[in-house]
């Protein structure tokens, strides 16, 4: 059985955001604006996405 994949895109700038939110975005593998990262769909990743939901967009 294959793992479910979630694609996340950084859609807002990190300028002026909290340091722990910047670290969370880096933990998701996102570096610059409009970058996309493919991650396994786990509860930990879902929590990270939820924490910075105002900065990222879930593509699929």
From Swiss-Prot:
GO biological process per UniProt: translation
Chain coiled-coil ranges: none
Keyword annotations: Ribonucleoprotein, Ribosomal protein
CDD domains named in the record: Ribosomal_L30
UniProt-listed SUPFAM superfamilies: Ribosomal protein L30p/L7e
Gene3D superfamilies: Ribosomal protein L30, ferredoxin-like fold domain (3.30.1390.20)
InterPro entries in UniProt: Ribo_uL30_ferredoxin-like_sf (IPR036919), Ribosomal_uL30_bac-type (IPR005996), Ribosomal_uL30_ferredoxin-like (IPR016082)
Domain of life: Bacteria
A GO CC term assigned to this protein in UniProt: cytosolic large ribosomal subunit
Annotated GO MF terms: structural constituent of ribosome
Family affiliation: Belongs to the universal ribosomal protein uL30 family.
Complex formation: Part of the 50S ribosomal subunit.
NCBIfam families: rpmD_bact
PANTHER family: LARGE RIBOSOMAL SUBUNIT PROTEIN UL30M, MITOCHONDRIAL RIBOSOMAL PROTEIN L30
Protein name: Large ribosomal subunit protein uL30
Organism: Ralstonia nicotianae (strain ATCC BAA-1114 / GMI1000)
């Amino acid at each position: 059985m294959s793992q479910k994949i979630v694609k996340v895109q950084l859609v807002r700038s990190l300028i002026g955001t909290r340091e722990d939110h910047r670290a969370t975005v880096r933990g998701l593998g996102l570096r610059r604006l409009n970058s996309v990262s493919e991650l396994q769909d786990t509860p930990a990743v879902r929590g990270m996405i939820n924490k910075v939901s105002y900065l990222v967009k879930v593509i699929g």
